[in-house]
Swiss-Prot record:
Bias-annotated ranges (Basic residues): 274-283
Family the entry assigns: Belongs to the universal ribosomal protein uL2 family.
Organism lineage string: Eukaryota, Metazoa, Chordata, Craniata, Vertebrata
Superkingdom field: Eukaryota
Keyword Heme attributed: no
Protein name: Large ribosomal subunit protein uL2m
GO molecular function, one term: structural constituent of ribosome
Keywords annotated in UniProt: Mitochondrion, Ribonucleoprotein, Ribosomal protein, Transit peptide
Length: 305
């Protein structure tokens, strides 16, 4: 009897997909007032019920990303530790958990970011250089015009220094000075660089760890070839901006932890103490360097022919 009743109930269900109705009026009238009008009035889609459990639902079709609603601030922001787990609660990265409470400071990795009312190269003054718990390198608070921002500090950067941010490529190479940001095409060959962009205007993505630096090897046909700290070569456009010098906190790899508890303070959990078989990866091997990584869209051979 129960099986017959369940069969009749399943047959009575309407399995047709939900139909989309016309956009409903604004559900968030306050969204227009946020971020000086950056948020537009979202249009909601009403789904008509097709099952008894789906009575009414409203979905936002054009709701902007949360990053566009976040206003930049130099004030440290509170963080919630994930313990290496994703949104499902499963561990994705082992060895993470616990540790002292940390506050996140928003780092501006796009060095050439002029103010709205100005254009061209501009200077900034270093206010302070301090420790950042969220990264191995030190950070610097710089000010220029009517704003302040955090950037990655270089090796010899101190409070009171003046740094230059430029996007101009001249006929002659500039006199490279530590802490300044220039396009790769404006720097002389052999310059030590850090915080390199992979695409113009995207922000620094390479050589950001403490004590690291790359080398500008050569410039070919509007592109620049640099050597990463791993000895791998990378080809990018010469308009990509890089910072001159070496990243701060050079002695980071020479520190002595001293005890296991200090690693727990840093948020590192212990791994298993069991003996693990060495599967062939252990030991030194002679491996060839990986091929050069290129972010430049070169024309193919078929297109040239």
């Amino acid at each position: 009897m129960a099986l017959c009743a369940l069969t009749r109930a399943l047959r009575s269900l309407n399995l047709a997909p939900p139909t989309v109705a016309a956009p409903a009026p604004s559900l968030f009238p306050a969204a227009q007032m946020m971020n000086n009008g950056l948020l537009q009035q979202p249009s909601a889609l009403m789904l008509l019920p097709c099952r008894p459990v789906l009575t009414s639902v409203a979905l936002n079709a054009n709701f902007v990303s949360w990053k566009s609603r976040t206003k930049y601030t130099i004030t440290p922001v509170k963080m919630r530790k994930s313990g290496g787990r994703d949104h499902t609660g499963r561990i994705r990265v082992h060895g993470i958990g616990g540790g002292h409470k940390q506050r996140y400071r928003m780092i501006d990795f796009l060095r050439f970011r002029p103010e709205e009312t100005k254009s061209g190269p501009f200077e900034e003054k270093v206010i302070q250089v301090r420790y950042d718990p969220c990264r191995s390198a030190d950070i610097a608070l710089v000010a220029g015009g009517s704003r302040k921002r955090w950037i990655i500090a270089t090796e010899n950067m101190q409070a009171g220094d003046t740094i230059l941010n430029s996007n101009h490529i001249g006929r002659m190479a500039v006199a490279a000075r530590e802490g300044d940001a220039h396009p790769l095409g404006a720097l002389p060959v052999g310059t030590l660089i850090n915080n390199v962009e992979s695409e113009p205007g995207r922000g620094a993505q390479y050589i950001r760890a403490a004590g690291t630096c790359g080398v500008l090897l050569r410039k070919v046909n509007g592109t620049a070839i640099i050597q990463l700290p791993s000895k791998r070569q990378m080809q990018v456009l010469e308009t990509c901006v890089a910072t001159v010098g070496r990243v701060s906190n050079v002695d980071h790899n020479k520190r002595v932890i001293g005890k296991a508890g200090r690693n727990r303070w840093l948020g590192k959990r212990p791994n298993s103490g069991r003996w693990h078989r060495k599967g062939g990866w252990a030991g030194r091997k002679i491996r060839p360097l990986p091929p050069m990584k290129s972010y430049v869209k070169l024309p193919s051979a078929s297109a040239q022919s």
